[in-house]
From Swiss-Prot:
Protein name: Inorganic pyrophosphatase
Binding residues for Mg(2+) 1: 66, 71, 103
Gene Ontology cellular-component annotations: cytoplasm
Requisite cofactors: Mg(2+)
Location(s), subcellular: Cytoplasm
GN (gene name): ppa
Organism taxonomic ancestry: Bacteria, Bacillati, Cyanobacteriota, Cyanophyceae, Acaryochloridales
Length: 172
């Protein structure tokens, strides 16, 4: 199965992004989309005894400062699968440094899940849940001897300008 990223809009409508899942929540397997083969390939298995807290992937047709598409993490009660496109509402972002590069993780909720209908910003998420997410990204590369640094959370107002910037950067 080949995936044509050009057919997946980054932002199908205002306030919504498409997140293409690379890694299902609860998994240690780190898949990445191979642009040449247009399929998902196993990049590595996490070295640590941790799992991705939620479905993790990227917003197609964006280009972030680290040279990759903008990362997205979608809070869901059930994991999906690599290759699933989730229309998602951004609610904030985790700013971090990964291997010396700035790296933002856009935290989203699924548009089509009524359990998250009232979740509009980070203020609607328990602070402990946000700490769990930050802790995952703070420590998931420790046994690889790679350094990540958490800079902090930014609320929903900071997300749209970044998404627009990354769409523009992708278009060149």
């Amino acid at each position: 199965m080949s995936i044509d990223l050009s057919r997946i809009p980054a932002q199908p409508k205002p306030g919504v992004v498409n997140v293409l899942v690379e890694i299902a929540g609860g998994s240690r397997n780190k898949y990445e989309f191979d642009k040449e083969m247009k399929v998902f390939a196993l990049d590595r298995v996490l070295y640590s005894a941790v799992v991705y807290p939620y479905d993790y992937g990227f917003i197609p047709n964006t280009l972030a400062d680290d040279g990759d598409p903008l990362d997205g993490l979608v809070m869901m009660d059930e994991p999906t699968f690599p290759g699933c496109v989730i229309p998602a509402r951004p609610i904030g972002m985790l700013e971090m440094i990964d291997s010396g590069d700035r790296d933002e993780k856009i935290l989203c909720v699924p548009v089509d899940d009524p359990r998250y209908a009232e979740v509009k910003s980070l203020k609607d998420i328990a602070p402990h849940r946000l700490e769990e997410i930050a802790e995952f990204f703070r420590t998931y590369k420790n046994l690889q001897k790679k350094v990540t640094e958490i800079l902090g959370w930014q609320d929903v107002d900071a997300v749209q300008p970044l998404v627009e910037k990354c769409i523009k950067a992708y278009k060149g």
